Amino acid sequence: QAFEETMNKAVRYQGTAFCHIHSISSDVLKGRMLQPSLMEVDRSFRRCLIGGTFDRFHSGHQLLIQTALRQADFIEVHVVNDEMAQTKGGWIQSLDDRMETLLSWLSDTAHLRYEVHVLNDPHGPAPTHRTADCIVATVETIPRCHQINERRYENGLPPLSILEAPHLSDELGGILSSSRIRLGLIDQEGHPWIPPSYEGKILRMPAVLDDEFKTPMGELFEGPEDAPEVALSAMLEALPENHGTLVAVGDVTVKGLMDMGVLPDIAFIDGQTKREALDASLLVRGDAYAQQRSVVNPPGQLTPELLDVVRWALEQDQSVLVEVDGEEDLAPMFVLATAPLGTIVVYGQPRQGVVMRILDMEAKHRARNLLVHFEAEG
């Protein structure tokens, strides 16, 4: 209801569209956020057009819009519809979710100087827009803006001034973008999910986190310990039809899935359950997997070698079995921190059942918040 009220106040759903843009102000490249009052700047333009998907609304999006607000009296933001957005790949937020986040930010930042519309085709209103006098673009989208101006010429309209804005770099050295966020590399401010100071270090879990790890990190499917197929069956029924990589952690969980005809894309095992060696009949068949790797990771720790293997496994196109010499219980932490959004992580919860987590931004934030409490050595 709150979203509908916001939409009624701020948005007119019209079939309008133009070019997709990502951008920032050059001030950010000097290490500063763009903070001067938007009301105190002399503006050169009346109405600026902005277009984009605005998935995982991030700092680059904010600075793009701020650039337009600094140079135009009024802005029109055109948001790609669901059908067009899905051509960019999976795990893109719905139009409603993207609109809600954008509108919330605009209401605090742009006051009454904006409209928001739905973008239903590549060019939309730009070729025939009679009141717009500028458009924002990055170097990649400038050619499309020239196409728009050619169509405006054919329609007897003056060209739009093209405001070129540079990209914003994330802390890993790439361009801050929604696609890199969906790939699980960075958050919406461009920060990596594993702090750089933790790279190459042995991470030891402090005792104060014991209770935290007793809380399931996803949806719990209950079932008896001596019949794991009960919980696993319920989990598989809840598994989305379209999902990312399936990662299973723990011998009982991995073998249970395999016995039910489901081969995880990535499996982590250590040959134990409750730190006791498994009977030979309960061991996972390694020959079922296309690739196998071994790694040392002592109990209560996360090693750099395990992190390297997790990253490697996530890049593979074939199934991977990772045999851990030590303990794999904490492996989900590295998976949650490094895997793309939409990845499915499944692991056993002692005496309760099986946990399934569909990797989203909330799960990544929780993983990072826990990791920063680990003691880094080396």
Model region roles, listed by residue range:
Residues D210-A363:
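Conserved mixed alpha/beta catalytic, RNA-binding, or beta-rich assembly cores of soluble enzyme
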